[in-house]
């Protein structure tokens, strides 16, 4: 590495299911993703990798390195919402910038609607992207969307902002340029705009021999998918717009990998590919696919398990499959370790200065670098906490075992988002090695007998959760999770808060 620090390129799709990548499903879906597969061929593919249950939570978990219950960013961010990334929470970009990196984010953000939430207020030098999920962006084009003559300030107060291009200023402020709305037509090719901007950023840093951290977040494959005319039908007959656009998404990944090759940066760059959460299957056929139970916004594996691939030539062995538990939380510590900072978690826990600001936070991630490089054969993470979008702990995994405390009993459709979780008086137990798809409780004649035999796990599980959550006493949630209902607004009115 010429400057002693690897470049870091993080590529994320949106709501992409494990089955949608042919390195996982081997053509089962009727098309292939050779460019994304290349990352797996030249690096590591994970089988037990955890995102979060929805867009905002997954992105916050990655960039902040904290369980979303700490940041309060568990609920999908909507236009006009007040909740977003707070200045007290550092990001990977904040830390890498303090250690000499140029930082750029391109594509979907979804970490807050307001100026203070934008990436260029949270460690990024440059941002060009949109702020929400695609279906929210196209709402103003609906025939019955509120019009100015009836609701004069509705669009301004509650509608989506445009695609923003922003730059961080040296004095801590930012410059913001609104490039216009993300219309249905623009959705067909907006990822190409983001890719072009990311390419310019990478080329510029390559010319100046500056290490870079780039987070390239495509808008695809979130629903609703708008495929450009030239791509329609390219997945083959009897396929779908979703599959046609997955091929475009794969081509975009191929283009940015080819750029690294062209610039001679491939050997010096960590490339990490993933997505935010499990697929939103209730919008099928405009939806991702997973073999796991459930989907986005549930407590089941299908809501949390996501594809994940990472490549670092010469450091990470090629064609490796890892079965250990790894999560989005782990990349803050892992990427800083790769950049030569092995103790970032300890520094932040004690309180440390980054770019002139002192931060004191509890990182929930583990340094996975020795596991990735083959120095150790086991992941340092042996557990995962499943937090839903209300900020509640619905389940915990420890090694093989998963205990479900709250379950979503709706099988699918948007009822998954509307119906409450059911609190179980006795938690359900699953063995995620013998029953990885969590089907035993509704397919096995002997499940309840088996569970009764394993009731010895329940009290230790409670003790484990209490032990792991003890850090919340010193580092409590930064803000209360948002809600789609009216309870928070009513509570604020009763308290006399002006933001109500």
Question: How should each PLM-predicted stretch be described?
Answer:
Residues 1-427, 432, 436-500:
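Formylglycine-dependent sulfatase
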């Amino acid at each position: 590495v010429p400057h002693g620090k690897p470049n870091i390129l993080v590529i994320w799709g949106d709501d992409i299911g494990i089955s949608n990548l042919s390195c996982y499903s081997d053509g089962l879906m009727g098309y292939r993703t050779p460019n994304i597969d290349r990352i797996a061929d030249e690096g590591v593919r994970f089988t037990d990798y955890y995102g979060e249950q929805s867009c905002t939570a997954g992105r916050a978990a990655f960039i902040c390195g904290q369980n979303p219950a700490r940041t309060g960013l568990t609920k999908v961010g909507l236009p006009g919402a007040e909740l977003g990334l707070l200045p007290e929470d550092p990001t990977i970009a904040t830390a890498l910038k303090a250690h000499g990196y140029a930082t750029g984010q391109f594509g979907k953000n979804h970490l807050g609607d307001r100026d203070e939430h934008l990436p260029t207020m949270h460690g990024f030098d440059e941002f060009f992207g949109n702020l929400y999920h695609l279906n929210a962006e196209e709402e103003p084009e609906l025939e019955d969307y509120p019009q100015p003559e009836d609701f004069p300030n509705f669009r301004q107060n509650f509608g989506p902002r445009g695609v923003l291009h922003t730059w961080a200023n040296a004095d801590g402020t930012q410059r913001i340029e609104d490039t216009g709305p993300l219309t249905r037509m623009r959705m067909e090719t907006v990822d190409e705009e983001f890719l072009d901007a990311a390419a310019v950023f990478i080329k510029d840093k390559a010319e100046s021999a500056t290490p870079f951290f780039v987070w390239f977040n495509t808008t695809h494959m979130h629903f609703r998918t708008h495929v450009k005319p030239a791509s329609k039908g390219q997945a083959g007959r009897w396929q779908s717009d979703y599959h046609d656009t997955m091929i475009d998404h794969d081509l975009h990944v191929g283009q940015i990998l080819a750029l690294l090759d062209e610039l001679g940066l491939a050997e010096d760059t960590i490339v990490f590919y993933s997505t935010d959460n499990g697929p939103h299957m209730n919008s099928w056929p405009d939806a991702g696919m997973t073999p796991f139970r459930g989907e986005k916004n549930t407590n089941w594996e299908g809501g949390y398990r996501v594809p994940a691939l990472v490549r670092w030539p010469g450091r990470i062995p090629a064609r490796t499959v890892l079965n250990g538990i790894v999560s989005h939380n782990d990349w803050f510590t892992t990427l800083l370790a790769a950049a030569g900072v092995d103790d970032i978690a300890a520094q932040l826990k004690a309180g440390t200065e980054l770019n002139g600001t002192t931060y004191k936070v509890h990182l929930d991630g583990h340094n996975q670098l020795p596991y990735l490089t083959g120095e150790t054969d086991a992941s340092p993470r042996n557990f995962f906490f499943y937090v839903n979008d209300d900020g509640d702990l619905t389940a915990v995994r420890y090694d093989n075992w998963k205990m479900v405390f709250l379950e979503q009993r709706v099988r699918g459709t948007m009822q998954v988002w509307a119906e409450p979780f059911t609190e179980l008086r006795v938690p359900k137990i699953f063995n995620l090695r013998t029953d990885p798809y969590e089907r035993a409780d509704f397919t096995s004649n002997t499940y309840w007998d088996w569970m009764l035999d394993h009731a010895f796990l329940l009290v230790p599980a409670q003790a484990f959760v209490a032990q792991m959550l003890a850090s919340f006493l010193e580092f409590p949630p930064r803000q209360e999770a948002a809600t789609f209902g009216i309870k928070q607004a009513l509570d604020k009115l009763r308290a006399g808060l002006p933001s109500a």
